[in-house]
Amino acid sequence: GKKEEILFTDKQPFVILVAGLQGSGKTTSCVKLSRFLKNDNRFPLILAADLQRPAAIKQLKVLAEREEIDVFSMETNDPIDVVSKGIEYANQNSFDTVIIDTAGRLHIDNTLMNQIKEINLVSKPDEILYVVDSMVGQDAIHAANKFNEYLNFSGIMLTKLDGDSRGGAALTIRSVVDKPIKFIGTSEKMDGIDVFHPDR
């Protein structure tokens, strides 16, 4: 297997949509990914589009600030609004990469699934990453299928892959949805992210 990375185009800003179930570690993953890309000479902006959890934006801002990463947020209940205005803001302020942190949602919640579909349409992402906790069980495979149906994501980001977990179900997800694992979270720390090398 070859390692699958994000293939950046000249598009400004390059948009990465991050989605997943509740509790999969999306917000932390967005900051880790931003930090990773910043070290790769990109200029990322995170859009705070997780409006379901009251503390989500605060958590995102605290984590991002420590890494000196910019966050765009708004006083609104509409993530679509955040996304369209955030991309506009990125354009005006020469950010070359936008990372959208979306609310964790259950695949059986049709309202929220339709919402992420709409976020996808509005943001026209160049890359859609599905975040999966490596400790998940079999039901996660069904969830991944559903997300893929709605979003047709381009890659998987495995979180909490430290210590003993070999990411059994998560690896099954890869073959079931036929999408590459692009990044793995290797520790709780903000530099705990790596491009996935299938042969390791």
Model-inferred region functions:
Residues 159:
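Phosphate-centric recognition/catalysis
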Residues 1-19, 24, 28-131, 135-143, ...:
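Nucleotide-state-sensitive switch-loop elements of NTP-binding domains
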